[in-house]
Each structure stands twice: as C-alpha cells, then as structure tokens.
Design a protein with these regions (language model features):
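The start of beta-strands in P-loop NTPase/AAA+ ATPase cores
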Residues: 9-11, 67, 179
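Non-catalytic pre-domain segments flanking phosphatase-related domains
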Residues: 1-13, 30
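Glycine-rich beta-strand-to-loop/alpha-helix junction loops that act as flexible
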Residues: 15, 73, 182-184, 197
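Active-site phosphate-binding/coordination module
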Residues: 26-114
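Hydrophobic "anchor" residues
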Residues: 18-19
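Receiver (REC) domain switch/active-site residues of two-component response regulators
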Residues: 67, 196-197
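Conserved acidic, metal-coordinating active-site core of Asp-based
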Residues: 100-195
C-alpha cells in the first residue's frame, strides 16, 4: 500500500475588493475566519496586494495567516516572525517616471496619500494612463503603470503580482501547481497568469 504524500497548498489572496467589505476598507471578518481555517488545516495563505507589504504582513500576523506577504504589486515581500523585506522593485525608477509624467502632462498628477512604499509610487487616478504609459515607453523608462481600480501604481517593469507570487513560493519552498489565486482587478491578472487555478 502506497501512502500519498500530502503537500501544503497555497492560497494567494488579494485584499481590496476580495476580502474587504463593499470592496474597500474594512476586512470582512467571515472571509478572514475562512482564510485562517485554511491555514489551520496545514496550508499557506499568502496575501498578495497592491497595498504595502507591511500592511499585508501585519494582516497576516494579526489574522493568523502565513507570515509572508507580497505587497506593492509584487515589488516587495515581507516575511518572518520579525519583519524581513525582500525588495524586487526599484523605487528610484518609479520616482523618475512619476516626475517625468508630472512635468509632461497638463492634468494635475499627484501621489496618493497611502502607507509608505519601498518599491513603487502610488498616484491619484487623475490622468490618461494609456497615454502616460506610451510616453514613458517612448522615453525608455523601465516602468509599467497599473490601474487597481482604486489608484494608479508605478512599478518596475517585470514586477507584478505574478512575479512577486513566484518569489514568495520560492521562499516557502512550495510548488506552483499547488497554488490557487483569488483577486478582483487588473493588477491581479499577472497572478492569475502564473497559477493554474484562479
């Protein structure tokens, strides 16, 4: 008789619009309780969000989830029982791109007041994002603009929730095939694209 080895599964879950009340703000406590029960059953529950990795890590600590969080749309991973940061993005590139579009657009372009970021810039939704991306590409900036539905995010090219999740899975030493992703916005699509189940 062969025993099947049970592997830990990973549930990668977004915050805003996915586990919040009315899409924004307060955490839906029933959703958090379900996530905790998945973790208590021996699986990993990893927050993957556009918010800061520190906010997500604190939610994982207080919520009883896996002590690892991917924040800033894949730009930073915060993990451990004491905070450890792994920076994947380059905030300097994002700041230079922000300054450039601010100086080349007629619209008022300004940073959104959010929890401080280590690898990205978060902007108010006040300008034409496809036009700005085209201009940045033409000028050779190494960034992508994303619309989360709440804010615009300036991230290093190649950095997104998918690449951040792949780095998190390496840290956890688990297989991609054992991962499920949940989310609700354009910024979650790269995460859906790297997993088989979303």
């Amino acid at each position: 008789l062969r025993l099947k080895i049970l592997k830990k599964k990973v549930l990668a879950v977004d915050i805003d619009g996915t586990i919040t009340l009315n899409g924004w703000g307060s955490i839906h406590l029933d959703a958090l309780a379900k996530l905790r029960s998945i973790k208590d059953a021996g699986n990993h529950v990893v927050i993957v969000t556009g918010r800061s990795s520190v906010e997500a890590w604190l939610l994982s600590i207080f919520g009883g989830l896996t002590h690892l969080a991917v924040g800033e749309n894949g730009g930073c991973i915060t993990s451990g029982d004491t905070m450890h940061h792994k920076m994947l993005g380059n905030k300097g590139d994002c700041l230079r791109a922000y300054d450039f579009i601010k100086n080349h657009f007629n619209e008022e372009i300004k940073e959104k007041l959010v929890f401080p970021r280590m690898t990205e810039v978060v902007l108010e939704r006040t300008f034409d994002i496809p036009r700005a991306q085209k201009l940045l590409d033409e000028e050779g900036f190494n960034v992508n603009l994303f619309d989360s539905g709440y804010t615009y995010h300036v991230n290093t090219k190649g950095i997104d929730k998918g690449s951040g999740l792949l780095n998190a899975l390496e840290i956890l030493n688990v297989d991609l095939e054992d991962t499920i992703a949940l989310g609700d916005s354009e910024t979650d699509v790269p995460m859906f694209n790297v997993v088989k189940n979303s």
